[in-house]
Regions:
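Segments that shape or occlude catalytic/ligand-binding pockets
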Residues: 255, 260-262, 274-442, 454
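C-terminal motif of bacterial Sec signal peptides marking the signal peptidase cleavage site
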Residues: 15-18
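Preferential activation on post-signal-peptide N-terminal prodomains/segments
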Residues: 20-328, 356
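Intrinsic disorder/low-complexity detector
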Residues: 6, 36, 325, 404, ...
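Positively charged n-region of N-terminal signal peptides that target proteins for export
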Residues: 1-9
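A short, surface-exposed beta-strand/turn
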Residues: 212-249, 320-355, 446-483
């Protein structure tokens, strides 16, 4: 069965469109005087095949400059030095400590006793059933014996008392941080700035800021099928482990005790302050220039965390944001920065993905297309759209709709922003081009029903009913559609 919710959560993280409203965003940088005047764009029409309704409404569309360089960028590994700068930007002078599963001698002795019983037939059959096949019993026993042997070896090298170890700014394979994986012998291979191809390594640390516990987690994944360089910093909420309702209640209490909880939405001044704080953080962390938008989000019903501020960033190059970075057909996540804050401005979570570095900037000999050039080209392309050329992953979506017997009644694309900036496209050698582009980001909705199952109109792309992010992007050098 298709997992729509997981897919859409991933898309929300990977397919960022950072065309933001002025009242909730950091001030856009000045890009020069040699630009056209801003445009009002208003149009409603149906595609030539009569299947898709498109509406475009933006009273202040971005102006098109006369020139923008084409940039070649490549993924930037997060080294130990870069990770240290990020941590200092986030936490100031607060000391970070190694994140580990280290146990004291006494605690290991307890684990040895636990696993000496866990390897017995009585324990295994109690966990897996009296009628469990003997082959299964033996496989479970082998796994538990390996853990028992691990603790027996660890006992001789363990400390009598476990005290925090200051962060050593070393990257380890992920197993280093696993339960039953602490390196008591100190023999695990580590890295600081060069990571072998095909390997994923982590640097994890913990700290406190204003009495709130945080984890700081950096990953460099150099595997062939999918690369990743990312940072996560987040509050360490205790694992309450009860029912969902009880967890929400305990989470609410914990957030209140930490001063992170609010039962009302942030007002405009708080949203603006959050964007300003995001700009400060990105500068202090050495992340380059970003443009931010913010929104109040209510997480009370889902997690018990209350109202928070969610800030979304778009990277800025040469004074222009990267408006669209499709993940389709690529082995590297879009460059993104998302932050969650309490209404007070206290950090709750920060996710930074796919840092890039510019390796070449190519000035264009010819001027960019003007709005007079682009408007008819864009409208003509939109009118010729079909399900196949508009709906992301249409073949697989159609296959699923056919399986469940869905009947489409309406496909609608609502565009409320027209943006000038860069669109990221794959290039050779694992790098990317940032292409000057005119973007029409919007919400794509596919409405339909399932005869005999769900007769009332339903959203076929998004079961939560929030639409589906898409962007129609046009190359300002030649007017062609990108992607």
């Amino acid at each position: 069965m298709k997992k729509y919710i997981s897919l859409l959560l991933c898309c929300a993280a990977l397919w960022l469109c950072a065309c933001v409203s002025p009242e909730q965003s950091a001030e856009a940088p000045t890009t020069g005087s040699n630009i056209e005047a801003a445009q009002a764009v208003n149009a409603e029409f149906t595609t030539d095949d009569g299947q898709i309704k498109i509406s475009i409404h933006d009273g202040n569309a971005d102006a098109i400059p006369a020139a923008m360089p084409v940039l070649r960028v490549r993924p930037k590994v997060i080294t130990s030095d870069i990770a240290r700068q990020m941590a200092e930007g986030l936490f100031g002078e607060a000391e970070l400590f190694e994140c580990s599963e280290e146990l004291s001698k006494a605690e290991i002795a307890d684990m040895i006793a636990v696993y000496e019983y866990a390897v017995t037939d009585e324990s295994i059959r109690a966990d897996h059933g009296e009628d469990a096949p003997q082959s299964w019993i033996e496989s479970v026993r082998d796994a538990r014996l390996a853990i028992l042997e691990y603790y027996r070896n660890a006992y001789a090298m363990a400390r009598d008392e476990v005290t925090p170890v200051p962060c050593e700014w070393k990257f380890y394979p992920m197993e280093h941080y696993a339960v039953h994986g602490f390196d008591y012998a100190g023999s695990d291979q580590y890295y600081t700035d060069t990571f072998p191809a095909g390997m994923s390594v982590d640097l994890r640390a913990v700290t406190e800021l204003g009495g709130v516990p945080y984890e700081f987690w950096v990953n460099n994944n150099e595997r062939e099928d999918f690369r990743n360089h990312s940072l996560s910093a987040f509050v360490l909420v205790p694992d309450f482990g009860e029912t969902a309702e009880e967890r929400q209640g305990r989470t609410r209490e914990w957030y209140m005790s930490m001063g992170l909880y609010s039962d009302t939405a942030a007002d405009e001044s708080a949203l603006d302050a959050a964007c300003a704080r995001a700009v400060e953080l990105s500068e202090e962390m050495g992340l380059g220039e970003w443009r931010f938008s913010s929104a109040a989000v209510d997480r009370t019903a889902s997690t018990g965390e209350g109202w928070q501020i969610e800030i979304t960033g778009a990277p800025v190059y040469e004074g222009y944001p990267v408006n669209w970075q499709s993940a389709a057909g690529q082995d590297y996540c879009p460059e993104s920065l998302t932050i969650r804050m309490a209404n007070s401005g206290a950090l709750i979570e920060l996710q930074y993905t796919s840092p890039m570095e510019v390796v070449e900037a190519a000035e264009q000999a010819a001027a960019l297309k003007t709005w007079a050039d682009m408007e008819p080209l864009a409208m003509q392309t939109m009118r010729s759209l079909s399900y196949e050329t508009l709906i992301p992953n249409y073949a697989s979506e159609k296959e699923w709709w056919d399986v469940i017997g869905a009947v489409i009644t309406e496909v609608r694309l609502d565009i409320d922003r027209v943006c000038i900036g860069y669109t990221r496209v794959p290039c050779d050698g694992g790098s990317f081009l940032l292409v000057p582009s005119l973007s029409f980001p919007g919400k794509l909705g596919v409405t339909g029903y399932i005869p005999g199952v769900h007769e009332s109109p339903m959203e076929l792309l998004d079961r939560d009913g929030d639409g589906y992010n898409v962007s129609l992007d046009f190359d300002l050098r030649d007017g062609g559609r990108i992607g």
